[in-house]
Regions:
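Hydrophobic ligand-binding cavity/cleft-lining segments
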Residues: 1-42
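Hydrophobic-ligand binding "helix-grip"
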Residues: 40-44, 51-53, 58-104, 110-112
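Generic structural signal for secondary-structure transition and capping sites
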Residues: 23, 34, 75-78, 132, ...
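A short small-residue
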Residues: 9-11, 107-114
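A conserved amphipathic terminal alpha-helix motif
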Residues: 110-143
Length: 143
């Protein structure tokens, strides 16, 4: 197999402006109990090098565990971790930036191989759904 075939991957990008300050978004991204309310149950700690897991709904031939490791923590700016499950080895990067009326949150999940079209489609749907849950959490004042 050629080297280029091994490294050709796709990146999913989801962006949304939230009518909330970056501090509120950052808490929702980095506090385990808040993260569980809009994303998945977890044992996350915002410490570079920390391994953690998300627990999703188990399915036939999958226990629902997403294995992760924190890569980057830049408070109020960037958060990144690996996201490994079902043969997908990817990296999730959240970037916060000032925006008119609030804070823009950009999520990039990189590492989808050409043969992982179904995983890419599932992630695209899933992250939109997760962002909707994040909006509800923030609007409810929990973060």
């Amino acid at each position: 197999m050629s080297n280029s075939a091994e490294t050709t991957t796709r990146t999913l990008v989801i962006e949304r402006v939230f009518a909330h300050p970056p501090e509120k978004l950052w808490r929702a991204l980095t506090e385990s109990q808040l993260l569980a309310q809009w994303l998945l149950k977890n044992d996350f700690e915002p410490v570079a090098g920390k391994r953690f897991q998300f627990q999703s709904q188990p399915m036939p031939q999958w226990d629902g565990v997403i294995k992760c490791e924190v890569m980057v923590v830049e408070p109020l700016k960037r958060l990144s971790y690996t996201w490994n499950a079902l043969g997908l080895e990817s990296v999730v990067l959240f970037t916060l930036a000032p925006a008119e009326g609030g804070t823009q949150l950009r999520m990039e999940q990189s590492g989808f191989r050409a043969d992982q079209q179904q995983a890419y489609g599932g992630a695209k749907y899933g992250w939109q759904h997760f962002f909707d849950g994040l909006e509800r959490l923030l609007a409810g004042g929990a973060a």
